[in-house]
């Protein structure tokens, strides 16, 4: 501030000196008139006198400021940053500030094709870094900066190359979706619709290739937006399989991504099949792989058999990889046909290869020679495995007596009350099933109390069990 104040102090002294010298009369001849900025003074009439002499340099023109009063050019003018709408430059103070001190710096620009230098600010700025804003994309211009003192502006410092305002460059990046990082499989006739996002500034240019060649526009369409590229195939064919490469470019920068597409269909059937051998209940088969695997690996073969009598096919083996097999557990006396399907990711082949010959499972010439067999006698006299149990009942409510007996042949069951048979009495119902004997007494009364006996009789003997039934009358209220 002291330096600035010092430079501002004498800023007007040269002009004041020149003005005063023009107004104060001098000892020079009256014909000599000093040239000044005042029009009025230029119109003063000339006195009658001898011819005037030529004016001296000190009175005719304003003296140029000495070189030591003007600052030198700023140092190290540097371009710090360029964006899509602004530019920032910085510099170092000049080596020589001048005797009158530094008032600031003037930053100017000159657009390409123009000759006029336009100041960025209306007055000098006491800063060594400045940002020019609100620039338009595509602008191209030169920049210079000058140091200014009271005596005037010093020589400028200028950038060597013009500045070009353009979008910030962001290196392109392709973000391949996770499901496309491995082989993308579609079936013949299905739609292929791939959307690949990317990044980059300014707007990247995207191109596709198929196996290193340009895309066939008759089959494949491509659309590129600001942030993604779409590859579309309406009806995929096996010829569309291959390596698709997406290249995204931003000026000299580029990014690439590779997507493998595999278009598949159902395989053809095995080329041939042969019945190798038949023995016992077994048959051996052999076949050759199909000529067309459907543009992908086989998952295996399905082997089926059919009995000549029924004609129904039954699966014997699934996803079987070898080309030979042995089928066992065939039924003696039947004749069998065999067929084989091929299988891949799309499923089974539409047709199968069938054996021309039948496999006849012959009956073996074996005569059975049974050894002597001793038949076991399972006859058994009756015996009770579960006896009758004493029971107490309430009048008017049916009650049941249970026991179980074992005997062979089946025994005859006789029920008795107080040693008297009760067969045929409608009050009682006797049942016997699987050795369990049941006697139901319908709505008993106290008169039905007594000892009940169950007797089992067959040709080998007899057995009996008994119990006591007590029917108690309800107490009177």
UniProtKB/Swiss-Prot annotation:
Annotated region Disordered: the residues are: 1-73
| Record-linked Pfam families | fn3 (PF00041), I-set (PF07679)
Domain of life where this protein originates:
Eukaryota
Q: Which GO terms describe its biological process?
A: cell adhesion; regulation of striated muscle contraction; sarcomere organization
**Alphabetical list of SMART domains matching this protein:** FN3, IG, IGc2
For the modification Phosphothreonine, the affected residues are 6, 26
The record places domain Fibronectin type-III at: 73-168, 269-364
Q: Name one GO cellular component term.
A: myosin filament
Is rRNA-binding included in the keywords of this UniProt record?
no
Question: Which residue range or ranges hold the Ig-like C2-type domain?
Answer: 172-260, 382-466
Q: Which PROSITE patterns does its entry note?
A: FN3, IG_LIKE
- Keyword Cytoplasm listed? The answer is no
Q: Which UniProt keywords apply?
A: Cell adhesion, Immunoglobulin domain, Muscle protein, Phosphoprotein, Repeat, Thick filament
- Entry's CDD domains? FN3
Q: In which tissues is it expressed?
A: Mainly expressed in the skeletal muscle. Slightly expressed in the left atrium and arteria mammaria interna.
Q: InterPro entries recorded for this chain?
A: FN3_dom, FN3_sf, Ig-like_dom, Ig-like_dom_sf, Ig-like_fold, Ig_I-set, Ig_sub, Ig_sub2
In its UniProt record, a GO molecular function of this protein is: structural constituent of muscle
Which family does this protein fall into? Belongs to the immunoglobulin superfamily. MyBP family.
Q: What does this protein do?
A: Binds to myosin; probably involved in interaction with thick myofilaments in the A-band.
Name of the molecule in the record: Myosin-binding protein H
- Which species expresses this protein natively? Homo sapiens
Gene, per the UniProt record: MYBPH
